[in-house]
Structures are given as C-alpha cells and as structure tokens.
Amino acid sequence: MPKPFLILQLRPENETADNEFESITHYGEIKKSEVVRIRAEKSGLPNIDLDDYAAIIVGGSPFNVSDKQEHKSEEQKRVELDFYNLFDRIVERDFPFLGCCSGNGLLGSYCGASISRKHGEPVGGANIFLTEEGKSDRLLKGLPSTFRVLLGHKEACDSLPPECVLLATNDACPVQIFKLKNNIYATQFHPEGDSEGFIIRIHVHYTCIHVQD
C-alpha cells in the first residue's frame, strides 16, 4: 500500500484552511484517502515519523517569521520551533518536502536566509520566470519558462538561502522557488491557489480585520 502524503496547515480559520486543503488535493491530483491532514496551528506538530509518509506539503499562514520575537504569540513561537526541529530531520534525509508561501519563509529562515518585508507583494496575479536551473529541474519539467500565478505575502527571503538553488524569480520578489538538496522545495507563491480560493481568503481576512477593529 502506498504511503500517504502529510499535509500540514497553519491557517486558523476553518473556511480558508478547508479551501486550501481542497485545492492542494485537487490540483495535486491526490486522493483524500492518500492524505493525512494536521492543523498545526491548533495542536502543534506531533512526533512525525518520516518513514510513515511519501512526502510533506505545507500551506500558507498568517504568521510572519520576520516579526520580532516579542510580537509573536506563544502559538507562533511553538509552531516555528516545531518546524525547525522537523527540518533537522527532513534536511538530513533529503525527504520530499514542498513549502508554499509560509512554508517558504519557514524553510528559508531555517536555512539561514534573512526574511523581511522588503519583497512583499500585494494580493493578485504575477508573472514568474524560471531560471536555467528551473527549466531543467525534474519537478518543474513541462512548465513554460514564464507563467502566471496568484500570490500575496508581506515577507519573503531577501536573498537565496545558503546551499540552495534558485529555480524561479521575478522583479518584485527575486526568490520565488528554491530547492535544497534534491527533494526539498519551497515556493513564495501559492501553486494551489485559484480565483475561488483567493476570494474566500480575501473575504475571511477582511472580515477578521473589521471584527478586530
């Protein structure tokens, strides 16, 4: 029996988390019977045995790695520590991993990159350009050299993390896809994102802001 994919989510709102999960499984062509789903923002990360899974996928999050420690919630501090401990084992084994948006920031920070708001991008569409390394990468094989994505993020890697390979870029945010070793990938944009999902995220975030006000 094939090993399942492990999808780790960090979104606190059920509506956005559920939509993200549906999008990952739909566009990834992954059967839900082949997935283990963990809402890490609710329960933290359990003791994950990598031998139990085929790969790990991490979605988006409202957390910003670049925030000062004194401004981070205890929940965020716990999540970051949990992921850094998990990355120790992922990197040691070159275990298949895909981090999307916040997964990019977490992995980039772990690898030693400076994360800041210098290269944030507003919610919307953007063109992404594959590098020469990206064009020959086995995971990105078949993608056009330029393609359109949906994104929206406050922070990003200031530069390529040490020992990583840049696979895709654009002018606004130079580090759009990077790879560590052979099987560890991160994207700044949302490869699972579609118009319906982004409308849901915008509506939920707008509502949350006005409720807080």
Label every PLM stretch briefly:
Residues 10, 40, 102, 189:
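Cofactor-binding loop segments of dinucleotide-utilizing enzymes, especially the Rossmann-like FAD-
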Residues 12-20:
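Glycine- and acidic-residue-enriched helix-capping/strand-helix junction motifs
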Residues 33-98:
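Flexible gly/pro-rich beta->alpha loop and the following alpha-helix that scaffold active-site loops
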Residues 103-106, 110-150:
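Ligand/cofactor pocket segment of small-molecule handling proteins
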Residues 7, 27, 45-48, 52, ...:
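Amide-donor transfer/coupling interface in amidating biosynthetic enzymes
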Residues 2, 23-33:
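A short, Lys/Arg-enriched amphipathic alpha-helix followed by its capping loop at the start of a domain
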Residues 1-7:
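Extreme N-terminal starter segment of soluble prokaryotic enzymes
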Residues 15, 65-67, 108:
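Glycine/Thr-rich phosphate-binding loops of Rossmann-like dinucleotide-binding domains
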